[in-house]
Each structure stands twice: as structure tokens, then as C-alpha cells.
């Protein structure tokens, strides 16, 4: 089944935010770079997705045209088969991604990127609902600790576990880097 790798929001905008933590980022980059290397060596197309949103001001690292809307430092270089700029959580909303996937005969997508429970999860659910098979590579996603409305802190690991729990066997196959690449063609 023809596959594409979706590299979602792996951009320099995130380290500019107060919630950014380097904890987990190095492991994330190791996994995501292994996905990139594996995809390139197998001829799997890679789609680069950037998130832009909010006011067009110098203080917004996600603003269209911000110098921070560029690949995250440490991300392996790759030639994108398609680059899209999204303004919503799903990479399939308001972008040419769905059309490109159909035109290129893509039936499975591998999801990796930042943030696990936001744009990666939302794109996974949306892609599944639209009929694509999805491999969600949790260790090639990154998120950060969050505080619930009740004041409880959830660790990034807890958030990832929750995301994987709600996606598995419903919206996606959970896969390691090696498993996702082995399934890809």
C-alpha cells in the first residue's frame, strides 16, 4: 500500500513558547530523524507541514512569515514532496494535502511531529475518518506537560499514553519507527 510520511509542525516556533521543554526533544529528534532517513532510503514521499496561526506580529512565532516558521533545529534535512501551511489542527483542513494524497495514490500515512495530542492526534483522526490507514508513531511525536482545569499536572508521557489509548484500533495502528517503515511501500 503506497505510503507517505507526514512531518507535522516540526518547527522552530515551539521552542519560542514558554511551555517548551528540552526534556524529550532529543529522543524525539532521534526517532523522527530515523523516520526521515528510512523514508528517504525507501523512496517514501515526505510531506512537510507547518502551522501558522494568530496575530501577524513580531512576537508571534507562529505568524505567517515569522522567521521561526522553519524546520526545528536538529531535524534531518529532506526534500519535501509537498509543503503545506495549515491554520487548523488537522493538516487536512484548508490545505492541498488531501488532494495531493489522492492524486499520488497514497492509502497509508505515517504521522509524526509536534504536538502529540493536538495536531498529530487531530490529523490522525481526520485521516482515518476520510479513509486513509494511519500509522501513529508515538515516539516520533513530542508534547509537553500540561495542567488540567482542576489544577493537576499531566506529564508529557501521560498525555502521549492517553493519545495512544484513544487512537489504537480505532483511528490508527500504533507503530515504532521500524514497524512503520517495514509496513511502508
Question: What spans do the regions from the language model cover?
Answer:
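N-terminal nucleotide-binding beta1-loop-alpha1 segment
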Residues: 5-10
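Active-site-adjacent betaalpha module
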Residues: 1-4, 31-42, 60-185
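Von Willebrand factor
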Residues: 39-54
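A short acidic, helix-capping loop that chelates divalent metal ions and anchors anionic groups
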Residues: 14-18, 55-58, 145-147
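Acidic/histidine-rich helix-loop elements
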Residues: 15-25, 151-153
